[in-house]
């Protein structure tokens, strides 16, 4: 009874509790989500967020056909990407998201929008590119068009084409083609099959305009493709001769048809090679030659070399080669070439005589002659040719055939000779005088000879007659009776005075040869006298010029000349008579040089009078005229001897006279009238070096700056008293320590003064740091070796300037090492510099920073990491920014600067480099590389230790810090119903590396269960292996989709398995085309002959899509039937049945067996139910009787016991709410009344909400409370037993042990 009341209170409370629970709900924005398609698998996609007013724990989930893209963490709602997204395949889809508390589940449909990313490179369509174009294709024409497709959208899907390379790679072909934005390739220059190239290969590339990919602006480019362009030759070129020049020779007596030479021409268009026809379009000798179709030039008529002498014995042929077909312009394609044929000589002519002069001879018959005339003077000298003889011998043959000999014959042949005696071709013939005595006009006036010309080979000859006429000559001269005539005449006689008129010459010749003409031959005095040409009288021509003192005797030659210009002469000796007409003449000039102090003057004045010697006209007297210095000298009046009276001093003479003393001497004769002459005697007193130079100062001090080459240091000045430049010229010289650093150059000022300019050479400068003071000695001396010298001290002080650049200390530039990622701070190095200048102000400057990674310049990445202070301290600026993976070597290029350096000098040192090596620390965790793959497992085909999936990872650290080791953390199998089953030891992973990428190969350890349907989720960990410090790791989850045996499809063929195996590739291709899946063929076997009716063999295969789903047999059948081409091909290959006939028969038998078994089970259940119903009805009736008896007995209970209402089945507690009078036992109790005497559940009702029963009997409750723990509850006693037991307890005061009953019959539950 207590259980009944407890149930009555608990059941309404439970209903109220359930009714009061509020369902959770998603947030308002949980309707759609936008995800980029390049989101990595395993990355967080979004969160499912819901709220529950009851604050119950929430569980999140996702379902629907596309739910496989995501993995939901049920407790947190985190959604990670489980399968890669692809905008181009599925840009939007829906999933059903759910959230539930312990009582209610709420679902909502969510729209997933995939955002496009630039993950696809352009792909060229129909990549087998080749074309042919004519070489005459106009520039700008479209050669070919290509198309590249980019599946991406927007700018990432817009394609730009480019030509990367043109083969052959020449200067002409580089820009021969260009590609337009639409993919059209346009000809950009002219083509030539023959002159350029007959084939081009273009390397093409297509790139998109770029877009975001993995959060980086990325430009995707296609793989290069190649376009082959063949240039088709066109007939646009003329033929070409294979040689640039043709020549040959042929004898002039060659017979007709003789082959001379062969010409050859080919079509200029090598790709066409049109046949060529030859012809002679022009010939300098038409008809002599012709040409055949084979290009052979032959003799076509008689040849005569002598007709070609003006043409250099050659015949010029213009040979034309014409192509058989017209060119592209409708014109004949032809080319011409000149062929030279030289005609060789044959000896077929004899020499002939011609009256002409070379080279004007034409050798025509009109010029041919055999009689010639000439003239010559009598007694002409030997080898004198005959005048007016124009004889030419000509033999038109060549070489030895044209060689001939000349000789003389006839009556006068001994007096003459012929020239030349031998000649080739042609020659001018001369007849020369051989014996002069035989050529005499007085003996004969004309002579005759024969000239014979004989061919040297054939001995054929010709003869010509030459008549020679002699000319008379003047062979007598005029003669004088005497060879010498002596004559006299006074000097200065009047013009026209006769000297003589008695001298005459005679000539025995008569006529013109005997007429005499007189003349004075040019010579001494011929201009003073003259002769009458007819009479021979000699007279004075110019008496003023007759001067005995100039010339006392004249010798003249008088010549007599006849009419033939023959002459003779005689000598005239004419003496002049003297008169006193000449003053004395002093001989020469008197310039006397004498050294001062030591030299003496002793000179005789030489004078003469041209008048006749030994007379007063020629006697002389000497007199010294007064002058400034004449008192120092004496002169003898008769002899003219001049002497000095004492020593002479140069310095006593006026310097303006430069040492010269001029004396005047008068020389006179004793004639009438007296004549005199003055002469100057110049006495030069030569200066001697008897004075030393003197400096104007006793010492000199100069100051000069260092590093100033060529500068003037100072000027010294000296004077020499000597008057001549030779003696007072001063030269300066330097000596002393460091004198080689200076140079001194003297300058003459005049009057013995000179300056010495002390300066530095142009290429020498002083260095204060080396030597600050120079003590020099300057010498002033005369060039005279006998002269002395004077010295003076010169002190040169070097003024220091800041002229030296600083230098960097090499030791301070030794490389240092700095760890990345903030491992070090502050100062890391000090750059030290020095300067020898005393006023130096140094600072260290940073010139450049070089950032390199593995020797490659990475730009300005590291510029802010370090700084250099003016004192040379090197500091770390951005310790956190130092990244070994970006830059492993920083080179600080520094220099030292002297701020006090004087202008014009180098203020900077040479650049130095401080190498800072960045040391790697393990600061980068491994990261997985995206894999756009779907891994599918067909357990039936997978073998142990074979790769089924792979991962790739990279670590940006280096060395051991970048070595990655893969491991499998967890393997879960998610079945199709959503259940997750953990697996351990199913897969293993093996690590390998290539370059800096590590790969993990996932392999099954054992064979996989082919009956499992679902997905393996493999969690892979990648962790590095640092030398020091903790390791870093990354994880990713792979989905391995399984294809179980339920997707195994069987195709039956009418051919044996051997033929099916042979056609395996064709069958696979047809199935792939029909299904668009990957076909995995499992087995090919023959069908048992006893079981098969028609098919002979079967093929088992799986058909798997890239996303891991597979085709069932029904889906396969539909897809094959929808593709008629593939179906036709499969039928041709022997396909007869989709699915196994045996399996269908076995399935039918199995269905029949299942139906029979089902009917048997149903019949058995009906019998059991009927039996049970019968037993229970009877039991119920007996129980009611027992209950009635128990009620009666209960009324007889002892005093003090409260009587209770009768418990009648179907009444009282069996009539309470939700009581079941027939099924009043717990659902776990199937016992019947007679199995348990203590079962009294008829006295309580069963709560339909739980399995707990409520005891109404107090004693029964006490019994339960005293039961030992962990003892299974005893079956509830029947009401009657309870009553009887209670009664017995009340009577005896104790309970008896329960008797054994069959619990299976203690209930009416069915």
Swiss-Prot record:
Changing residue 1310 to R: Loss of interaction with USH1C. The modification Phosphoserine is found at residues 1248, 1299. The chain crosses the membrane at residues 1155-1175. Residues 1299-1310 have a biased composition (Polar residues). Residues 1259-1310 are annotated as: Disordered. Residues 27-124, 125-241, 242-353, 368-480, 481-586, 586-695, 696-808, 810-928, 930-1058 form the Cadherin domain. It is found in: Apical cell membrane; Cell projection, Microvillus membrane; Cell junction. Keywords: Calcium, Cell adhesion, Cell junction, Cell membrane, Cell projection, Differentiation, Glycoprotein, Membrane, Phosphoprotein, Repeat, Signal, Transmembrane, Transmembrane helix. Residues 1259-1268 have a biased composition (Basic and acidic residues). Glycans are attached at residues 29, 134, 182, 188, 195, 300, 355, 371, 401, 460, 565, 600, 616, 632, 680, 696, 701, 775, 821, 871, 877, 911, 932, 1107. Residues 21-1154 are extracellular. InterPro entries: Cadherin-like_dom, Cadherin-like_sf, Cadherin_CS. Residues 1176-1310 are cytoplasmic. It is a single-pass type I membrane protein. Residues 1-20 form the signal peptide. GO terms for molecular function: calcium ion binding; cell adhesion molecule binding. Highly expressed in liver, kidney and colon. Moderately expressed in small intestine. Down-regulated in a number of liver and colon cancers. Expressed in duodenum with higher expression in enterocytes along the villus axis and lower expression in crypts (at protein level). GO terms for biological process: brush border assembly; cell-cell adhesion mediated by cadherin; epithelial cell differentiation; homophilic cell adhesion via plasma membrane adhesion molecules; intermicrovillar adhesion; negative regulation of cell growth involved in contact inhibition; regulation of microvillus length. The cadherin 1 domain is required for binding to CDHR5. Part of the IMAC/intermicrovillar adhesion complex/intermicrovillar tip-link complex composed of ANKS4B, MYO7B, USH1C, CDHR2 and CDHR5. Interacts with MAST2. Interacts (via cytoplasmic domain) with USH1C and MYO7B; required for proper localization of CDHR2 to microvilli tips and its function in brush border differentiation. Intermicrovillar adhesion molecule that forms, via its extracellular domain, calcium-dependent heterophilic complexes with CDHR5 on adjacent microvilli. Thereby, controls the packing of microvilli at the apical membrane of epithelial cells. Through its cytoplasmic domain, interacts with microvillus cytoplasmic proteins to form the intermicrovillar adhesion complex/IMAC. This complex plays a central role in microvilli and epithelial brush border differentiation. May also play a role in cell-cell adhesion and contact inhibition in epithelial cells. This is Cadherin-related family member 2. It comes from Homo sapiens (Human). The gene is CDHR2.
